[in-house]
Amino acid sequence: MYDGPAIIRVNDADHGARVRLTGHLDPIDGRYHWRGMVSDCALDPTLRLPQQVSVSIEGRTSQGQLTEMTPWGTHCVAGVGMPPYPVG
């Protein structure tokens, strides 16, 4: 699990954010699935979702997707493969 600062890249623009991410190794497909919340991020409120993004944490970058916006203005993010935070 990771809870801290990150850079969210959307449409070639970087946005500072706070993320709370967790994940698991899926026994069916054998891949690591990670997901979580993005907050404190000044994304365009008219951004169409789902939206491809990259999430960078301390030099590690992973591709993911913003899947929805919550009623509180945060965004859900999900990805498959190596997460942007250390697993261990």
Where are the language model's segments positioned?
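Short, compact, well-ordered microdomains
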Residues: S54-G88
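Solvent-exposed edge beta-strands and adjacent loop segments
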Residues: M1-D29
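Short acidic, gly/pro-rich beta-turn/loop elements at beta-sheet edges
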Residues: D29, P45-R48, Q65, V87
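Charged, amphipathic alpha-helical segments
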Residues: G30-D44
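Short, ordered beta-strand-loop transition motifs
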Residues: L25-H33, T67-T74
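Short conserved beta-strand and strand-loop elements enriched in small hydrophobics
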Residues: G4-V10, L49-G59
